[in-house]
């Protein structure tokens, strides 16, 4: 995990400052999503994003938020999808109020920004790479997962 600096008399370790429990040494929330009104710059909502389920020695589902290392992808229908957290989930949020409207468990860390594409069937798909990340300590993997967004007639946006 370190950086040898190739002959320098010192080295660095690039990782967050964590407690013995594997949790950040700062007061939660450790990660959140926020909606901002761009006409006046005011925060409209701020919601905790993530749990410590995959960070702590015990799988505790406390919603304290987790550090984010990837950005969201936003759909024209007003949804934001995030998978760049240190828990093994991809989540969908309603941009109007920041409420979580969907979530799926990933087989490994999804520390990346999701992608989206329009299929030949006319449906929109969300794609997540669950590859993990060695610096965050998440399990590594090699999964590429596609989720079909609901069609407009099924209540999709």
Regions found by a protein language model. Give the residues of each.
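A fold-level detector for beta-propeller and closely related beta-sheet-rich head/sensor domains
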Residues: 1-157
């Amino acid at each position: 995990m370190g950086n040898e600096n190739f002959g320098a008399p010192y080295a660095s370790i690039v990782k967050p400052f964590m407690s013995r429990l594997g949790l950040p040494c700062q007061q939660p929330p450790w990660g959140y999503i926020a909606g901002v009104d761009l006409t006046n710059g005011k925060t409209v909502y701020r919601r905790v994003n993530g749990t410590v389920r995959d960070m702590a020695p015990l799988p505790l589902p406390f919603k304290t938020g987790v550090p984010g290392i990837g950005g969201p992808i936003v759909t024209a229908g007003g949804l934001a999808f995030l998978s760049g957290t240190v828990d093994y989930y991809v989540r969908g949020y309603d941009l109007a109020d920041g409420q979580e409207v969907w979530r799926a468990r990933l087989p490994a860390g999804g520390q990346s920004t999701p992608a989206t594409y329009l299929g030949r069937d006319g449906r929109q798909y969300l794609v997540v790479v669950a590859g993990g990340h060695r610096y965050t300590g998440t399990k590594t993997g090699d999964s590429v997962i596609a989720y079909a967004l609901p069609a407009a007639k099924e209540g999709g946006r």
